[in-house]
Amino acid sequence: MPIDHVLKLYSESVRSPYLHYGFWDNPESVNASEFTLNEMVKAQGRYIEHLVSFIPEDVKTVLDVGAGIGGNSSYLLSKGYEVEALSPDEYQEKVFAEKYNGEVKFYRSKFEDFKPEKKYDLVLESESACYIQIEPGWETARKTIRDGGYLLASDYFLHHNDGSGDWHVKAAHDEKVYMETAEKYGLKLIREYDQTENTMPTLDGVKAFM
């Protein structure tokens, strides 16, 4: 896959180890017009902290799918997890090679095309689920996750199609179809959390910067 130049530009401009949204515990008190880039990076740190709080205690090995530039993998390593990473992006592969020098094994592949060499306790899809085709994605997940293992997805999903044709409607997976397909491949929902309000200041902040 060619380089995603939008994500590359973002990472080089913001100088954050993360490519995902920020997370605010009290979003109603946030004034986006007063954002600084440092505050945004801290909020991105809270995002992965909150996400990792959902990982069950019996998880030791994690495949970071759509691994970006390694921020999530670094956090997982700091918490004692054994981490490997996957992304089809050439630039992200280069970043991982420079950052980890082989400490974190990196697979340059679409998840749908991934041929796992082993099985993992957990597959993490942090804002990458929407890039993965639903049916082949769950088929690969079933082959990649050990029996009794987990998939932790954090992304935006479509609850209602307003017919607007906006990018977020086109990009998001239909949540009902996504979950029904998961069940088809033997996975069931354990826990969910709607963090829409917690992450919305990210978009408000982007507007303020523009």
Where are these regions (language model features)?
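N-terminal, positively charged/glycine-rich alpha-helical extensions of SAM-dependent methyltransferases
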Residues: 1-30
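Conserved alpha-helix/loop element of class I SAM-dependent methyltransferases that forms part
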Residues: 41-58
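Class I SAM-dependent methyltransferase SAM/SAH-binding core
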Residues: 63-113
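A short acidic, Gly/Pro-enriched loop at the edge of an enzyme's catalytic core
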Residues: 113-123
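A short SAM/SAH-binding and catalytic strip from SAM-dependent methyltransferases
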Residues: 122-135
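A short glycine-rich, Lys/Arg-flanked "PGG" loop and its adjoining helix->strand segment in the class I
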Residues: 136-150
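Conserved class I S-adenosyl-L-methionine
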Residues: 152-177
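Short alpha-helix
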Residues: 171-192
